[in-house]
């Protein structure tokens, strides 16, 4: 791997999901094991993901404080992600604890979730605007994420891509950062690009709404410099059941004239 490669490590779910950050022996032992793993990998950040079922009560916040006061993090930083709770809804007691222990507030910039406070490290996990992680961001959305991440005073920015096509989308943003331009994602433009994308796994016969549901989250090259969601174009189709990709393309040719 590259000499400048940096690991980040996600804490074992027993800490956050099974024992819900209670100051019990199992949690403290798991923390120690995770610290050892981070040390072996020279990881600067350990990510803690708290499930949406986690209740932010006075007791749970005290439990978190007790855990943090019982472990020696040394140089290891924690990035805490509270699933299902927006930054503005986090209790002041929790935010005070996070600041006291120099914890990074992890959010999803792709869904417009900014951290509750700034840290020297910005850590974001990107899932997109679809259901779960079924989404592919447009160039404009990636650019907006980049602008949001760069707008503060953070010295380091860590983006963890979780879109369905996470590797390709991360590479797209990297290309943009290096060249100032987003790359094409197919070998052609317009309907030919759409056909290339749909040919990957679209099933036929299929009704219009089923095509939009299964394929609409993807993007294609409308032009060399403009990528849009497949659903934006499929939405122009007449309501019908389509037997093959050629029939879809032929109908779209008519509505695009």
What are these regions (language model features)?
Residues 1-186:
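Residues lining hydrophobic/aromatic ligand-binding pockets adjacent to catalytic sites
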Residues 185-257:
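Charged, amphipathic alpha-helical regulatory modules used
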């Amino acid at each position: 791997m590259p000499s400048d490669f940096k690991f980040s490590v996600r804490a074992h779910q027993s800490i956050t999901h099974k024992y819900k950050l209670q100051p019990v022996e199992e949690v403290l032992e798991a923390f120690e094991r995770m610290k050892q793993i981070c040390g072996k990998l020279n990881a600067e950040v350990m990510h803690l993901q708290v499930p949406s079922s986690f209740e932010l009560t006075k007791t749970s916040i005290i439990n978190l404080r007790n855990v943090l006061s019982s472990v020696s993090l040394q140089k290891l930083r924690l990035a805490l992600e509270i699933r299902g709770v927006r930054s503005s809804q986090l209790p002041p007691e929790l935010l005070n604890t996070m600041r006291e222990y120099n914890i990074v507030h992890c959010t999803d910039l792709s869904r417009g979730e900014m951290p509750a406070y700034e840290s020297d490290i910005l850590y974001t996990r990107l899932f997109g605007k679809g259901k779960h992680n079924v989404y592919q961001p447009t160039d404009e959305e990636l650019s907006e994420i980049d602008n949001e991440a760069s707008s503060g005073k953070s010295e380091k920015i860590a983006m963890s891509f979780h879109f369905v096509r996470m590797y390709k989308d991360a590479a797209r943003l990297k290309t943009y950062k290096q060249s100032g331009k987003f790359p094409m994602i197919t070998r052609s433009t317009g309907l030919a690009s759409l056909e290339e994308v749909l040919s990957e796994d679209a099933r036929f016969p299929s009704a219009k709404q089923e095509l939009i549901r299964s394929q609409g989250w993807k993007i294609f090259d409308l032009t060399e410099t403009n990528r849009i969601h497949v659903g934006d174009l499929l939405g122009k189709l007449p309501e019908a059941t389509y037997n093959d990709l050629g029939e879809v393309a032929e109908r779209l040719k008519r509505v695009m004239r």
